[in-house]
A protein has these predicted regions:
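Transmembrane alpha-helix interface/packing and boundary motifs in multi-pass membrane proteins
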Residues: 22-40, 120
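Hydrophobic alpha-helical transmembrane bundles that constitute the permease/transmembrane domains
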Residues: 33, 125-129, 149, 153-157
Length: 204
């Protein structure tokens, strides 16, 4: 399945160039199974080969990232914090989440919104998800777009640049991104366990 997806991604970039990169990055933001660790390094390889330029590929990928992030932001903003709070009040107990937990999360995001968006765009698995709390909290659109663009440019430059440097060995980028993803998963797991332990102790 992943092999077929990778082949399709490469075919889109071969056919459409930078436009294909932008479209794929939009999809990657709203449909996570499309992996940026394939899209971006391969785009760098294509540019290094002479079918485009690295700068144009980075620009196209950043445009795609901003558009994709804006889609998720818009969906979350339409749902809004009121519906989210109502959902937590009604169903939160099934997930071990209380309205006060949501309130603390909202307050944390409000304090750290800039860092969350800027740095989150450089972290695998978090890159797309960070647009959702920004939308729920209805973060001001101009700063959201600005910091999304800056963070996305850094990520895109790193992966496209690596693909351009490695040339026909661009696939060597993927294992390193996979390691970073597992680190993120491990950190999330630790936070979830810590949250659960704290809740259990409070109930005891």
């Amino acid at each position: 399945m992943l092999g077929d997806l990778a082949s399709w991604v490469q075919d889109v970039i071969e056919r459409l160039g930078a436009v294909g990169v932008a479209l794929l990055v939009i999809l990657e933001n709203v449909f996570p199974p499309i992996p940026s660790e394939i899209v971006l390094p391969f785009a760098g390889f294509v540019a290094q080969r002479g079918d485009g330029s690295v700068v144009v590929m980075i620009f196209a990928a950043t445009i795609g990232a901003v558009v994709g992030a804006l889609i998720l932001y818009g969906i979350a903003a339409v749902i809004g914090p009121e519906r989210l709070r109502a959902f937590v009040v009604r169903f939160g107990r099934w997930f071990g989440v209380k309205p006060t937990d949501l309130q603390r999360a909202e307050e944390w995001f409000d304090r750290h919104a800039v860092a969350a968006v800027l740095l989150g765009r450089c972290v695998p698995l978090i890159r797309s998800v960070v647009s959702v709390p920004a939308g729920f909290r209805r973060m001001r659109l101009a700063p959201f777009l600005l910091y999304t663009a800056i963070g996305s440019t850094a990520w895109n430059t790193a992966l496209i640049g690596a693909g351009a440097v490695l040339g026909n060995q661009w696939e060597r980028v993927e294992p390193y991104v996979a390691i970073l993803q597992w680190v993120v998963v491990a950190l999330i797991a630790v936070l979830v366990v810590r949250f659960a332990v704290v809740r259990i102790r409070r109930r005891a």
